[in-house]
């Protein structure tokens, strides 16, 4: 096996064969690696000069798991035989049942199939901070190399279920406390200690433990069944649409009832079935799509190097500004928070402190790191601290004259290299920077609320934004643990523009007689975090009212003119902010549907006059789902046609991370392609005849439907000067 992907074996004078996985950067289990492991293990078992084996990984990492690229090939071909036999042939027969003991020497990480290999060894030695986990369920599958059987036997059912169903990583130090790791040592001592341990097993001075044969951590049959049943009920609540959760529990139960070997055989069968499931195809697509978002033609492929961003100024300490500042502070970036008066500044600083305390409570930040973050924050009422900032992010209210004035000032007070970013969600960037001469430095940094938690960052460029500014903001996005998606400059950018029909479609359904709370139930059941009306309550009605005229001007006849939000406000309803919207909100309680909102709904229907003959329309749940999401798909087609996004998969990630579109459906465009353009076009055409241009199919969709092409296929007319590539 030539090249970087290989398995090596070195036999020392002590009789220990050190087998090393070499596949940078994380030693993924490519089929070549798996074949190499089989060959080296077979050779070690046959050689008289080998007494024991140490399995490790090159470059300070044990193994990051199975090579996910293989799943893509399986999905393309439908040929599951491309998956090599690892569970039985390698882990069970060659490693665990082998006549010579194996010890896993772990550092860096042992994830997925990597951790499963270690559990096929007879002992595990690790550095304390190594990350251990079985994250397979995030890809729509289950551990397939024996993990569902061995992990419960090493750490007990409750911990194993937690690690697998939540895809939770633990450190090796935690693993030692729980029984997964046998001993901890420094990186310098790892191989030496592992060799000695392997020899002591071979010489019967340490126990020769085959994990699959253990039952002492499983508890009694009744206890195991109780734990599994409880886990099933929990999975139904939190993962109702995800088949891999119940499948994982089924396979674990098989092992408990019928023994480890029977469990391994069932695991292998179910694993192959799940690899070909729609859920796995969608989640694997989303995995690779997220990696692609940072590949930007003309920016990341032209030998530019990102500049160091050490100090950032945030203008505006409201909800968005304080959230953005929080995200920067947590990443150890110095922040200047500017406000217009001491009261607003103090409020912004308090919001940042509250955000940080919230992260501590959630366990994602230590108290020490919180204090360090706060020490990096400086308040300001003028621009005197802007002379050495590397980036400014403006996050004030959506008023054009105010933003123009700020950017005109920034050009005068900031250094020439400073990036001038705006968090606007609706205003044309060319308008924002109209009164400056530094248009190449102006860029959109559109965060989603709450900015320190939501993972998406829309990076908006104009035709004048420099590639360097884009690259720098991509780098900052990654630094603050956001997923950056580069988009073009248009009303609503990619996410808000694509999803503007989402709320409007729900309003149309209400106008023709469909119950508000039924709509929310249908959309939640589909996999959205909440329905459109609960989302409106949470976001507040101010945003909807603020963008109403902007969308009407930009989108013309396909914009639905609805006065439902106006009527809600007139009725004294502001959503969650005043405890009363479509739902009632009590402190600490769950939202409850408010029956009294029907008065507002009735008035809205009278104003809309869209119910045929004044009678409610009868629709199935599928009709409701399609009438809300197909217009969204239709707008996504326009976004792709205008090249607002670089590729369709960027819109998939933006829909998942920005709007909560279910990841297990692969993203908006991926989901639409599973349905097909002809069907979507036919339904939209039918509704256009009944309800008007809100549903009118775009030319892009019409073309794809006529030719039965996927919506995600690259646009043949796409030019290098597309908006997202400017």
Curated annotation (Swiss-Prot):
It comes from the Eukaryota. The keyword Lyase applies. It catalyses: a (3S)-3-hydroxyacyl-CoA = a (2E)-enoyl-CoA + H2O; a 4-saturated-(3S)-3-hydroxyacyl-CoA = a (3E)-enoyl-CoA + H2O; a (3Z)-enoyl-CoA = a 4-saturated (2E)-enoyl-CoA; a (3E)-enoyl-CoA = a 4-saturated (2E)-enoyl-CoA. One of its GO terms (cellular component) is microtubule. Its EC number is 4.2.1.17, 5.1.2.3, 5.3.3.8, 1.1.1.35. The keyword Hydrolase does not apply. Its main location: other. GO terms for molecular function: 3-hydroxyacyl-CoA dehydratase activity; 3-hydroxyacyl-CoA dehydrogenase activity; 3-hydroxybutyryl-CoA epimerase activity; delta(3)-delta(2)-enoyl-CoA isomerase activity; enoyl-CoA hydratase activity; microtubule binding; mRNA binding; NAD+ binding. Pathway: Lipid metabolism; fatty acid beta-oxidation. Keywords: Cytoplasm, Cytoskeleton, Fatty acid metabolism, Isomerase, Lipid metabolism, Lyase, Microtubule, Multifunctional enzyme, NAD, Oxidoreductase, Peroxisome, RNA-binding. It is found in: Peroxisome; Cytoplasm, Cytoskeleton. Multifunctional enzyme involved in fatty acid beta-oxidation. Also binds to RNA and microtubules. Possible role in subcellular mRNA localization and RNA-cytoskeleton interactions. In the N-terminal section; belongs to the enoyl-CoA hydratase/isomerase family. In the central section; belongs to the 3-hydroxyacyl-CoA dehydrogenase family. Monomer. The epimerase and isomerase activities are contained in the N-terminal region while the dehydrogenase activity is in the C-terminal region. This is Peroxisomal fatty acid beta-oxidation multifunctional protein. The gene is MFP.
């Amino acid at each position: 096996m030539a090249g970087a992907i290989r398995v090596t074996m070195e036999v020392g004078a002590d009789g220990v064969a050190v087998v090393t996985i070499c596949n940078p950067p994380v030693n993924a289990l490519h089929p070549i690696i798996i074949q190499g492991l089989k060959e080296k293990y077979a050779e070690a078992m046959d050689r008289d000069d080998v007494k024991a084996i140490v399995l490790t990984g090159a470059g300070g990492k044990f193994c990051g798991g199975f090579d996910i690229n293989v799943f893509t090939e399986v999905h393309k071909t439908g040929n599951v035989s491309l998956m090599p036999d690892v569970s039985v042939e390698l882990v069970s027969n060659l490693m665990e049942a082998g006549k010579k003991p194996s010890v896993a020497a772990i550092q860096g990480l042992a994830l997925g199939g990597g951790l499963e290999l270690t559990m096929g060894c007879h002992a595990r030695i690790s550095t304390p901070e190594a990350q251990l986990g079985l994250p397979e369920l995030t890809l729509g599958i289950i551990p397939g190399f024996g993990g569902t059987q061995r992990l419960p036997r090493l750490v007990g059912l409750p911990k194993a279920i937690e690690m697998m169903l939540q895809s939770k990583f633990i450190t090796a130090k935690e693993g030692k406390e729980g029984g997964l790791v046998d001993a901890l040592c420094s990186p310098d001592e790892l191989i030496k200690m592992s060799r000695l341990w392997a020899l002591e097993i071979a010489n019967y001075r340490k126990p020769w433990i085959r994990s699959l044969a253990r039952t002492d951590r499983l508890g009694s049959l009744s206890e195991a069944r109780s734990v599994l049943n409880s886990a099933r009920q929990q999975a139904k609540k939190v993962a109702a649409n995800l088949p891999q959760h119940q499948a994982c529990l089924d396979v674990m139960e098989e092992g408990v009832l019928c023994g480890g070997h029977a469990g391994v055989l069932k695991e292998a069968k179910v694993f192959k079935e799940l690899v070909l499931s729609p859920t796995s195809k969608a989640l694997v697509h989303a995995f690779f799509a997220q990696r692609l978002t940072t590949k930007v033609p003309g920016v990341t492929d032209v030998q530019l190097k990102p500049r160091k961003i050490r100090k950032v100024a945030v203008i505006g300490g409201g909800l968005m500004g304080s959230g953005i500042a929080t995200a920067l502070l947590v990443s150890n970036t110095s922040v200047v928070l500017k406000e217009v008066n001491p009261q607003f500044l103090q409020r912004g600083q308090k919001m940042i402190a509250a955000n940080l305390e919230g992260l501590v409570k959630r366990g994602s930040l230590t108290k020490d790191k919180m204090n360090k973050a706060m020490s990096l924050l400086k308040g300001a009422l003028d621009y005197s601290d802007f002379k050495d900032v590397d980036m400014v992010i403006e996050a004030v209210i959506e008023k054009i004259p105010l933003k123009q004035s700020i950017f005109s000032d920034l050009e005068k007070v900031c250094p020439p290299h400073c990036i001038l970013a705006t968090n606007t969600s609706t205003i044309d960037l060319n308008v924002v920077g109209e009164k400056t001469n530094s248009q190449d430095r102006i860029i959109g940094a559109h965060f989603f609320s709450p900015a320190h938690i939501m993972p998406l960052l829309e990076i908006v460029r104009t035709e004048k934004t420099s590639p360097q500014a884009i690259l720098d903001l991509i780098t900052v996005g990654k630094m603050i643990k956001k997923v950056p998606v580069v988009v073009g400059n248009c009303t609503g950018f990619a996410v808000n523009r694509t999803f503007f029909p989402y709320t409007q479609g729900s309003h149309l359904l209400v106008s023709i007689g469909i119950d508000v709370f039924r709509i929310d139930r249908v959309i939640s059941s589909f996999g959205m975090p909440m329905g459109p009306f609960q989302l409106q309550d949470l976001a507040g009605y101010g945003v909807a009212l603020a963008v109403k005229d902007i969308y009407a001007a930009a989108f013309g006849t396909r914009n639905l003119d609805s006065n439902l939000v106006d009527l809600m406000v007139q009725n004294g309803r502001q959503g969650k902010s005043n405890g009363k919207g479509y739902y009632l909100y009590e402190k600490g309680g769950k939202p409850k549907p408010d029956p009294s909102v029907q008065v507002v709904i009735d008035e809205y229907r009278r104003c809309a006059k869209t119910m045929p003959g004044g009678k409610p329309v009868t629709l199935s749940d599928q009709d409701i789902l399609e009438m809300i999401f197909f217009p969204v798909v239709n707008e996504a087609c326009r976004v792709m046609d205008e090249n607002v996004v670089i590729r369709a998969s960027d819109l998939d990630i933006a829909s998942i991370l920005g709007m909560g579109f279910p990841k297990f459906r692969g993203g908006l465009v991926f989901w639409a392609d599973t349905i097909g353009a002809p069907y979507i076009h036919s339904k939209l055409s039918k509704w256009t005849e009944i309800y008007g241009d809100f549903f009118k199919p775009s030319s892009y969709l019409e073309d794809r439907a006529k030719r039965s092409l996927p919506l995600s296929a690259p646009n043949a007319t796409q030019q290098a000067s597309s908006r997202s590539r400017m």
